[in-house]
């Protein structure tokens, strides 16, 4: 829905040269809406000039591109246009260049000079990008190259120095982009464009490069560190963790593939693990911890006991958890604060079921997001757990993909979950009824790879839809799509 003000603004921007000439005559209060309309409609000349002459200290994508009173479209929930993103960057460099070459004349009022360009919060769903949209990798590269070019091509003359602009971004780095991102961070220290990272995600980066990058980041800006596919091991983790622990205001730490055999621990392995635990105790503000695909069998108590404050998000996917790990978590101070819990890939079907049910009871008051993908939960286990599960009254998201559930089990879940008024999304498996010749119990790999009978599944979907309609729950999404943007990030809960 668009207001008359929005439609009038869109009309004003139809002729870009005229709109650019008119900008100095327009009230500054119109600039936020002008920015959103120009960004949405790819009015790149206007967009560049808007950034060039921005009259406020802050230009924030999260503020300007969300749903507003004049336009219900939230651009940050979409992939952003490459043309529009590049226009913003060009407008910023033009602004700095103007200040450098015309320093003595002060063409831009320093009282209202732009101080912060906040480009954080861009959609990063991991899906292959449209060539006309900018991924997080593209954004990282574009901003980094701009900082490098600005430092190499600076032409400031004696007199009034340019007003520094802090560029806040979420950075994504891998082996291919590491070198120029490191150069950009080094260059920005003495540049009028100061690169400031809010969330860092490093994928498959060598240990020494990870450390070098961490040493260049501003401890006051960083909110999240996410190290993916690095297969660190305890030895590698003991090298990296002190460099991570200096960010004592870090809110989210995501570490993956930290391997170490807890069943046959070596002396060095134990020393490295104790050192890791000691460093984890330095974080004062940690709210989210993810240790996906890390071997934590029987060690969860050691890990969680070192933390200074209760967690609100805990991801322990494929961590080979034991019953005692689940019992400890249920009795810990973390349970009463957890909003998000991911136990995917841990077998909850045997002697772990009762401790798991106890854990659900402990987190029922606060839990919003529960992920149980590939947990070997068949109908019997699900039905036994439903009385506890439905006590999670605030639950919004339930992930059950990859579990051997039948249509009967799914229907029972749907009926019982009617009492969960906040539930909005259920990611369910293809029912075992839709497969042919499944071994029993079916391994998760078989459920993920085997072909299903499309005709049978179409009937299942239709029946589930009718049950949702009959129960007045048509607004709840039941889906088998595990690749959509359905799982909420902790910071959006």
From Swiss-Prot:
The LRR repeat ranges on this chain: 111-146, 194-218, 219-246, 247-282, 283-307, 308-339, 340-360, 364-391, 392-416
SUPFAM superfamilies to which the protein is assigned, alphabetical: RNI-like
Domain of life: Eukaryota
One example GO MF annotation: kinase binding
GO cellular component: cytoplasm
Keywords, ordered alphabetically: Cytoplasm, Leucine-rich repeat, Repeat
A Pfam family per the record: LRR_6
Main location: cytoplasm
Entry's localization field: Cytoplasm
GO biological process: negative regulation of NF-kappaB transcription factor activity; negative regulation of toll-like receptor signaling pathway
InterPro entries associated with the record: Leu-rich_rpt (IPR001611), LRR_dom_sf (IPR032675), PRAME_domain (IPR050694)
Assembly with partners or alone: Interacts with IKBKB; disrupts IKBKB-IKBKG interaction preventing I-kappa-B-kinase (IKK) core complex formation and leading to a decrease of IKBKB phosphorylation and NF-kappaB activation. Interacts with CHUK.
Function of the protein: Negatively regulates Toll-like receptor-mediated NF-kappa-B signaling by disrupting IKK core complex formation through interaction with IKBKB.
Family statement: Belongs to the PRAME family. LRRC14 subfamily.
Protein name as annotated: Leucine-rich repeat-containing protein 14
Source organism (scientific name): Mus musculus (Mouse)
């Amino acid at each position: 829905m668009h207001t008359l003000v929005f439609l009038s603004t869109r009309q004003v921007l139809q002729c870009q040269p005229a709109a650019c000439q008119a900008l100095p005559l327009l009230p500054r209060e119109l600039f936020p809406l002008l920015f959103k309309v120009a960004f949405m409609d790819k009015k790149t000349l206007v967009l560049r000039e808007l950034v060039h002459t921005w009259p406020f200290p802050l230009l924030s994508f999260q503020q300007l591109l969300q749903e507003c009173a004049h336009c219900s479209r939230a651009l940050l929930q979409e992939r952003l246009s490459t043309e529009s993103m590049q226009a913003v960057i060009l407008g910023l460099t033009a602004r700095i260049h103007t200040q450098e070459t015309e320093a003595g004349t002060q063409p831009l009022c320093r009282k209202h000079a732009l101080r912060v360009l906040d480009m954080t919060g861009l959609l990063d769903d991991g899906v292959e990008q449209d060539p006309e949209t900018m991924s997080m990798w593209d954004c990282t590269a574009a901003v980094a190259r701009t900082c490098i070019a600005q430092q190499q091509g600076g032409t400031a003359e004696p007199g009034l120095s340019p007003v520094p602009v802090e560029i806040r971004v979420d950075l994504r780095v891998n082996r291919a982009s590491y070198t120029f991102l490191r150069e950009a961070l080094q260059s920005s220290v003495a540049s009028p464009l100061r690169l400031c990272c809010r969330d860092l995600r490093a994928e498959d980066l060598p240990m020494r490069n990870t450390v070098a990058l961490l040493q260049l980041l501003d401890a006051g800006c960083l909110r999240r560190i996410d190290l993916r596919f690095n297969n660190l091991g305890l030895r590698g983790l003991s090298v990296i963790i002190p460099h991570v622990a200096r960010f004592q205001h870090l809110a989210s730490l995501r570490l993956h593939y930290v391997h170490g055999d807890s069943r046959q621990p070596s002396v060095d392995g134990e020393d490295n693990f104790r050192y890791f635990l000691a460093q984890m105790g330095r974080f004062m503000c940690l709210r989210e911890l993810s240790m996906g695909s890390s071997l934590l069998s029987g060690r969860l108590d050691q890990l969680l006991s070192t933390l200074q404050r209760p967690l609100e998000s805990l991801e322990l996917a494929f961590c080979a958890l034991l019953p005692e790990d689940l019992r400890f978590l249920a009795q810990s101070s973390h349970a009463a604060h957890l909003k998000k819990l991911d136990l995917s890939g841990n077998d909850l079907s045997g002697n772990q079921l009762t401790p798991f049910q106890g854990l659900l009871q402990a987190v029922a008051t606060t839990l919003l997001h529960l992920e149980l993908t590939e947990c070997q939960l068949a109908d019997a286990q699900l039905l036994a757990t439903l009385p506890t599960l439905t006590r999670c009254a605030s639950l919004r998201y339930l992930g059950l993909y990859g579990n051997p559930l039948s249509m009967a089990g799914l229907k029972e879940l749907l009926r019982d979950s009617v009492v969960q008024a906040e539930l909005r999304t259920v990611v369910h498996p293809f029912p075992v009824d839709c497969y042919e010749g499944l071994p029993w119990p079916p391994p998760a790999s078989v459920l993920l790879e085997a072909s299903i009978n499309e005709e049978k599944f179409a009937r299942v979907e239709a029946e589930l839809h009718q049950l949702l309609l009959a129960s007045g729950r048509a607004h709840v999404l039941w889906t088998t799509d595990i690749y959509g943007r359905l799982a909420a990030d902790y910071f959006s809960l």
